[in-house]
Design a protein with these regions (language model features):
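Phosphate/diphosphate-binding loops
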Residues: 20, 27-30, 35-39, 73-93, ...
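Flexible glycine/proline-rich, aromatic-decorated loop/lid segments
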Residues: 37-72, 262
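Glycine-rich, anion-gripping cofactor-binding loops and their flanking helix/strand elements
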Residues: 5-26
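Hydrophobic alpha-helical scaffolding
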Residues: 7, 11-14, 54, 61, ...
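Short acidic (Asp/Glu) and glycine-rich catalytic loops that position anionic groups and cofactors
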Residues: 1-5, 64-73, 90
């Protein structure tokens, strides 16, 4: 692999074993990032292609509920920003694969003609109804989509849903005296995913900010001499990060829970790249760690502030460059 073209993702924040990910990026000859914010990954790119955000263009949203929702441009983009589809079209054309569209409706109509289940979900119908769930095969007003995909029976020989059992596989990472606790990465309301968007929202930053939290059981915290809201070090075989303890009876004893979106308290620095043989997903939910209290909390607080400021400065300088 010699190059990477990344759109709307931040693997230098979200992938497991971030030290290995950074090394992989350094070995690439070319890194292109197309995004709306300056992320950690964008700061490591050779070429940055800034694109418009959802409020600066129109299009169609979809989700796991099979729904299509047309959305409209709210404001004109500043500077000479292009939409994702315009950027892709120009690059493809210059690389010898001509792509010429005048608007998003032309792209959507092409998709409709390729997929019979989408064909009836026209731009006009989505604009009138606001929401359509596929299958929607007829362009007439009579076909307003399908609320229940399998209302009476499933698409199986006997009409029943099929369930399959999975064999339990032991975690690859192992607990030891040096790393006696289990880290499981989770998601919570507030800052979502890699935090690129929510981290730029002042209201959400006021609810919770760097370096994030590690939820720890009350008994474990007492044994380790850790108080609620205190800064702590979390170590694994792959690295260490600083974070804030959130002490309660909610976590299981012997386990800590961390969300992976924090920039300073990036728990994916700790997670090992042990891949599932079936899904090829890393062991995000099981990582052997050690939690240590920090005696000098004032110095620790200043360390977090300094690291946060250095990161923001680096991202700003990368954006200006």
């Amino acid at each position: 692999m010699r190059a990477a073209y990344i759109m709307g993702e931040d693997p230098l924040q979200t992938d497991a074993e971030l030290s290995a990910v950074r090394k992989a990026f350094e070995d690439l000859e070319l890194v292109i990032v197309q995004d709306i914010f300056m992320t950690k990954t964008a700061s490591a790119a050779d070429v940055i292609l800034p694109s418009t955000s959802w409020g600066e263009h129109e299009g169609v949203f979809t989700a796991a509920d099979r729904g299509f929702q047309r959305f409209f441009k709210a404001v004109e983009p500043k500077w000479d920003l292009k939409t994702d589809w315009q950027i892709i079209s120009e690059i493809a054309t210059r690389m010898g694969y001509p792509m010429h569209y005048n608007n998003t409706q032309e792209i959507w109509d092409e998709l409709r003609h390729l997929c019979p289940d989408f064909y009836g979900a026209t731009y006009e119908k989505m604009g009138e109804l606001g929401f359509i769930q596929w299958p929607c095969r007829d362009t007439s007003d009579a076909d307003q989509g399908t609320s229940y995909l399998f209302k009476e029976k499933f698409d199986t020989p006997n009409g029943l849903a099929q369930f399959f059992t999975c064999d339990w596989v032991a975690p690859i990472d192992k607990l030891t005296d040096e790393y006696p606790m289990v880290l499981s990465t989770v998601r919570e309301v507030g800052h979502y995913s890699c935090r690129s968007m929510t981290g730029n929202c002042a209201a959400l930053a006021a609810l919770a900010d760097e370096p994030g939290y590690a939820q720890i059981n009350t008994e474990d915290a007492k044994r380790l001499g850790i108080e609620d809201e205190a800064l702590v070090w979390v170590h694994s075989r792959k690295g260490k990060i600083i974070t804030r303890a959130q002490v309660s009876d909610r976590p299981n004893k012997g386990a800590i829970y961390m969300t992976y979106q924090w920039w300073i308290g990036a728990c994916n620095e700790l997670v090992t790249e042990n891949l599932s043989p079936i899904t090829k997903t890393p062991e995000y939910k099981y990582c052997a760690v050690r939690v240590e209290s920090i005696a000098d909390q004032r110095a620790a607080e200043q360390y977090v502030i300094d690291e946060y400021n250095k990161l923001k400065t680096r991202l700003r300088e990368a954006a200006l460059a």
